[in-house]
């Protein structure tokens, strides 16, 4: 019986790094609390938007081909016309310049995983690069 216990430890120790890697992956899946706190009141809990007032996120090019523009829109806000899906809307979105890079990464990861075209997350380094290139 003691031999069985001794044989279990190498197996447990061998699996431990894989379990640690898997638990780390969960952290990069995005945090709905940032979205719920800053975005859901206008864009809706399910990203559906609000009729002609606020655009839906479910069919947004900013979560696909134009993902590099999203950090600038979030940090600077939007005033005026914006193309969303098949429509052009005249909107006012407040700036969220106070979000940290970590919060921005969490928010964009959450958006990508829920409504993005590829369902991929982006790195904090990439977000920082995009923010440096904002107009």
Per-region residue spans from a language model:
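N-terminal hydrophobic targeting signals that begin at the initiator methionine
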Residues: 1-2, 26
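Bacterial N-terminal signal peptides that target proteins for export
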Residues: 2-14
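Residue-level signal for mature regions of secreted extracellular proteins and peptides
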Residues: 18, 32-35, 127
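Sequence/structural segment immediately N-terminal to covalent heme-attachment motifs in c-type
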Residues: 26-50, 66-76
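Axial heme c-ligation environment in periplasmic c-type cytochrome domains
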Residues: 51-58, 79-134
């Amino acid at each position: 019986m003691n031999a069985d216990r001794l044989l279990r430890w190498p197996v447990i120790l061998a699996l431990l790094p894989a379990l640690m890697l898997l638990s780390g992956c969960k952290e990069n899946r995005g945090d709905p609390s940032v979205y719920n706190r800053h975005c859901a009141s206008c864009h809706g809990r399910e990203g559906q938007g609000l009729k002609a007032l606020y655009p839906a996120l479910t069919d947004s090019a900013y979560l696909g081909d134009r993902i590099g523009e999203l950090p600038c829109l979030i940090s600077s806000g939007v005033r005026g016309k914006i193309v969303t899906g098949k429509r052009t809307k005249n909107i006012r979105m407040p700036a969220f310049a106070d979000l940290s890079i970590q919060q921005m990464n969490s928010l964009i990861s959450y958006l990508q995983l829920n409504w993005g075209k590829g369902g991929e997350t982006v790195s904090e380094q990439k977000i920082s690069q995009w923010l440096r290139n904002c107009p």
